[in-house]
C-alpha cells in the first residue's frame, strides 16, 4: 500500500476518532464528518485513477454531491439549534419534542 493511501486512511481514522470523542458538540461532529467525507473522496479518486475504472469516474463527484448536501443540512440544523437553544450541545436537545 503506498504512503498516500496510508495517510488518507489515517486521516479517516483520525476523523472517526474525533467524531467519537467530540460528539457532545454539534459543530465538532460536523467538522469531523466533513473530514471523513474528504478522505473518502480522496481515497476513492485515487483508487479509480490507479485501477483505471472508466465506468466509475462519476463516483467521486457523486460522493462530493452527497457531502455538500450533508454539510448544508448539518449547518441548517446547527443554525436552527443555536437560534432556539443558544447552545450546540447535543446532550441538551430533546429530539422527541415537536
Swiss-Prot record:
<keyword id="KW-0520">NAD</keyword>
<keyword id="KW-1133">Transmembrane helix</keyword>
<keyword id="KW-0830">Ubiquinone</keyword>
<keyword id="KW-1278">Translocase</keyword>
<feature type="transmembrane region" description="Helical">
    <location>
        <begin position="29"/>
        <end position="49"/>
    </location>
</feature>
<comment type="function">
    <text>Core subunit of the mitochondrial membrane respiratory chain NADH dehydrogenase (Complex I) which catalyzes electron transfer from NADH through the respiratory chain, using ubiquinone as an electron acceptor. Part of the enzyme membrane arm which is embedded in the lipid bilayer and involved in proton translocation.</text>
</comment>
<dbReference type="GO" id="GO:0008137">
    <property type="term" value="F:NADH dehydrogenase (ubiquinone) activity"/>
</dbReference>
<keyword id="KW-0813">Transport</keyword>
<protein>
    <recommendedName>
        <fullName>NADH-ubiquinone oxidoreductase chain 4L</fullName>
        <ecNumber>7.1.1.2</ecNumber>
    </recommendedName>
</protein>
<keyword id="KW-0812">Transmembrane</keyword>
<dbReference type="InterPro" id="IPR039428">
    <property type="entry name" value="NUOK/Mnh_C1-like"/>
</dbReference>
<feature type="transmembrane region" description="Helical">
    <location>
        <begin position="2"/>
        <end position="22"/>
    </location>
</feature>
<dbReference type="GO" id="GO:0045271">
    <property type="term" value="C:respiratory chain complex I"/>
</dbReference>
<feature type="transmembrane region" description="Helical">
    <location>
        <begin position="61"/>
        <end position="81"/>
    </location>
</feature>
<dbReference type="Pfam" id="PF00420">
    <property type="entry name" value="Oxidored_q2"/>
</dbReference>
<dbReference type="InterPro" id="IPR001133">
    <property type="entry name" value="NADH_UbQ_OxRdtase_chain4L/K"/>
</dbReference>
<comment type="similarity">
    <text>Belongs to the complex I subunit 4L family.</text>
</comment>
<keyword id="KW-0999">Mitochondrion inner membrane</keyword>
<comment type="subunit">
    <text>Core subunit of respiratory chain NADH dehydrogenase (Complex I) which is composed of 45 different subunits.</text>
</comment>
<keyword id="KW-0249">Electron transport</keyword>
<dbReference type="GO" id="GO:0005743">
    <property type="term" value="C:mitochondrial inner membrane"/>
</dbReference>
<keyword id="KW-0679">Respiratory chain</keyword>
<keyword id="KW-0496">Mitochondrion</keyword>
<dbReference type="GO" id="GO:0042773">
    <property type="term" value="P:ATP synthesis coupled electron transport"/>
</dbReference>
<keyword id="KW-0472">Membrane</keyword>
